[in-house]
Amino acid sequence: SPVKSGLFFYMKVSIQGVKGSFHHLVTVNYFSSFELNECSTFDELVKSIIDEDSEYGVMAIENSIAGSILPNYALIDEYNLSITGEYSLSIDHNLMCLPGQSIDEIDEVHSHPMALLQCTKFFTKYPKIKLIESEDTALFAKKIGENKINGVGAIASKEAADIYLSLIHISEPTRPFH
């Protein structure tokens, strides 16, 4: 159960993804104080709640472009979980790579399939860049940064770039990256 610390409750919150992911951004904005439990999959996130390793989980269930995320609704139903809150996050996709590289030096870009789909129009200007699907937006940014992979970019949040990489194209709310 949550531990009371001053005026705030300190709790363990599971997310699918890593720091800098959109689930992490929701967690930071929604909870006043928390310990983050990074999960590889939504199944792992649900297991952490069922096993009482976490008090809460942050899970996307709607996407304004793709609609309902039915597999996540199925997990909620299958494990009889309750939705206890809601947070709407405006998603801004940003292109990032190792510091010092330019977009002309990028041969491939990795990200979640939905992020790649939403940025397709932008990449028509860069036909040499191969788009490659990965399981999470921020996770591949982390991998590029940790392994110092040259010539490879990621599409993720600005916060992921702040943690792991360097921005080379910033999404602007009035002129979306996609």
How does the language model describe each region?
Residues 1-8:
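Positively charged N-terminal leader segments that act as targeting/secretion signals
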Residues 11-17, 107-110:
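Short, well-ordered beta-strand elements
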Residues 21-25, 44:
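Short N-terminal binding/cap micro-motifs at the start of the first secondary-structure element
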Residues 37-50, 132-143:
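Short helix-initiation/N-cap motifs at beta->coil->alpha
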Residues 44-102:
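Short, glycine-/small- and polar/acidic-enriched structural segments
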Residues 55-59, 150-156:
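Paired acidic/hydrophobic, glycine-rich loop segments that form the ligand-binding mouth/hinge
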Residues 78-139:
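A conserved helix-loop-strand patch within extracytoplasmic ligand-binding domains
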Residues 169-178:
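Single conserved hydrophobic/aromatic residue that forms the stacking wall/gate
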